[in-house]
C-alpha cells in the first residue's frame, strides 16, 4: 500500500523532504507524459495515461501533509476519513465554533483584516498540528494521528473558506 512512496523512492514517513518530492515528480511526469507516447501502441498510450494519473495522484497526496498522514495511516489499515471516525475533543469543538463565528462575522461585515487575522491564526494551528503529527508518527500512535488528520481536514476546509471570502 506504500505504492506512492515507492513510486517516488521515498521511505514511508510523515516527515519527508518536499524538495526531493518536487524533483522526482517533475522527472516522473516528464518521463511518463502521455504526449511522449503519441506514436506508441494503444496499449502503451493507455498505460502512459494511467501512469501519469497515478503520478499526479501520488504527488498531490504526498505533497499535502494531511493527505500524506491519512495515506500513511491507510498503509497501517486505519481509515482516518471513515464516517465512524468523526468525533473531536470537546475543546477542539469549542474552538471550531469560535472560528466559524469569527468567519461568519468577518464575511457579513466584509472585514478583510479579520479574515486575514483568522487565516494567520488557522495557519499557525496547522503548523502546530503538523508538529503533533510528526510526533504521533514517531511514537507510532496511530489513534492520535487519525484524530489529528480529522482536525487537519477541518482546518484545511476552514482555510479554503477564508480564502474564498478574501
Swiss-Prot record:
All copies of domain J, residue ranges:
3-75
Keyword Membrane in the entry? The reply is no
Q: Does the keyword Chaperone apply?
A: yes
Q: Which PROSITE patterns match?
A: DNAJ_2 (PS50076)
* This protein's UniProt keywords: Chaperone
Q: Name one GO biological process term.
A: protein folding
Q: Which GO terms describe its cellular component?
A: iron-sulfur cluster transfer complex
Q: Which PANTHER family match?
A: IRON-SULFUR CLUSTER CO-CHAPERONE PROTEIN HSCB
- Assembly with partners or alone: Interacts with HscA and stimulates its ATPase activity.
Q: What does this protein do?
A: Co-chaperone involved in the maturation of iron-sulfur cluster-containing proteins. Seems to help targeting proteins to be folded toward HscA.
Give the family from UniProt: Belongs to the HscB family.
Q: What is this protein called?
A: Co-chaperone protein HscB homolog
Which organism is this entry from? Neisseria gonorrhoeae (strain NCCP11945)
Amino acid at each position: 500500500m506504500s505504492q506512492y512512496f515507492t513510486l517516488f523512492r521515498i521511505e514511508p514517513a510523515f516527515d519527508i523532504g518536499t524538495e526531493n518530492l518536487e524533483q522526482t515528480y517533475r522527472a516522473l511526469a516528464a518521463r511518463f507524459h502521455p504526449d511522449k507516447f503519441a506514436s506508441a501502441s494503444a496499449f502503451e498510450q493507455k498505460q502512459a495515461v494511467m501512469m501519469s494519473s497515478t503520478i499526479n495522484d501520488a504527488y498531490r497526496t504526498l505533497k499535502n501533509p494531511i493527505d500524506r498522514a491519512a495515506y500513511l495511516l491507510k498503509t497501517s489499515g486505519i481509515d482516518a476519513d471513515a464516517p465512524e471516525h468523526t468525533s473531536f475533543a470537546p475543546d477542539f469543538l469549542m474552538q471550531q465554533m469560535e472560528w466559524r463565528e469569527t468567519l461568519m462575522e468577518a464575511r457579513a461585515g466584509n472585514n478583510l483584516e479579520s479574515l486575514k487575522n483568522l487565516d494567520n491564526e488557522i495557519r499557525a494551528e496547522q503548523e502546530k498540528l503538523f508538529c503533533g503529527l510528526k510526533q504521533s508518527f514517531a511514537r507510532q500512535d496511530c489513534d492520535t494521528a487519525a484524530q489529528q488528520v480529522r482536525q487537519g481536514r477541518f482546518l484545511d476546509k476552514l482555510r479554503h473558506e477564508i480564502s474564498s471570502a478574501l
